[in-house]
């Protein structure tokens, strides 16, 4: 199972960008159940927030609703244990924002095979495999198409 960061969802549903097609491929693979994935309520909230800055609220909420079942049904972490681990990561990893530290803690606690994100701050973590959602990253996750 992989864990998705907001960047994957934003690029998959956003405007032209070098990461858009690889992120779309990954989201499609998740929807087709070719790869198991999870994320957090915070990631969905951030995605909806970013989307609502460029589109109307109904569009943003609809995409959030579509994304939730595909990415949230596979893992439900202990909020207390994950938050404690996330706060430790936040405290000890200067480049990591608080919300990203909690996401990394979810990935580590879930035994995820990868945390997929365009954010380079995740590369500084030793207990989470960070995969950039570019063409090479998608080959590592989905194999060569």
Curated annotation (Swiss-Prot):
Source organism's superkingdom?
Bacteria
Q: Which organism is it from?
A: Mycobacterium tuberculosis (strain CDC 1551 / Oshkosh)
State the needed cofactors, names only: Mg(2+)
Q: Which HAMAP family match?
A: VapC_Nob1
Enzyme Commission code? 3.1.-.-
Q: Name one GO molecular function term.
A: RNA nuclease activity
Query: A Pfam family matched by this chain, by name?
Result: PIN
| Family matches, as PANTHER family | RIBONUCLEASE VAPC13 (PTHR38826:SF5)
Protein name as catalogued? Ribonuclease VapC7
**Keyword Nuclease, does the record have it?**
yes
What keywords appear on the UniProt entry? Hydrolase, Magnesium, Metal-binding, Nuclease, Toxin-antitoxin system
Residues recorded as binding Mg(2+), renumbered to this chain, are 5, 100
Enzyme class, top EC level, equals hydrolase
Q: Cross-referenced Gene3D superfamilies, in alphabetical order?
A: 5'-nuclease
Start and end residues of each PINc domain: 2-129
Q: What does this protein's UniProt record list under function?
A: Toxic component of a type II toxin-antitoxin (TA) system. An RNase. The cognate antitoxin is VapB7.
Family per UniProt?
A: Belongs to the PINc/VapC protein family.
């Amino acid at each position: 199972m992989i864990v998705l960061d907001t960047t994957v969802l934003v690029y998959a549903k956003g405007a032209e960008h070098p990461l858009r097609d690889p992120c779309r491929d990954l989201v499609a693979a998740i929807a087709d159940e070719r790869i198991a994935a999870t994320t957090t309520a915070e990631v969905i909230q951030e995605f909806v927030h970013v989307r609502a800055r460029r589109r109307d609220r109904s569009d943003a909420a609809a995409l959030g609703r579509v994304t939730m079942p595909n990415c949230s049904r596979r893992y439900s972490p202990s909020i207390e244990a994950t938050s404690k681990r996330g706060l430790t990561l936040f405290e000890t990893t200067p480049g990591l924002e608080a919300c990203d530290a909690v996401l990394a803690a979810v990935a580590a606690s879930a035994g995820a095979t990868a945390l997929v994100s365009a954010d380079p701050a995740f590369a500084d973590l030793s207990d989470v495999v960070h995969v950039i959602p570019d063409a090479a990253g998608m080959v590592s996750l989905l194999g060569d198409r």
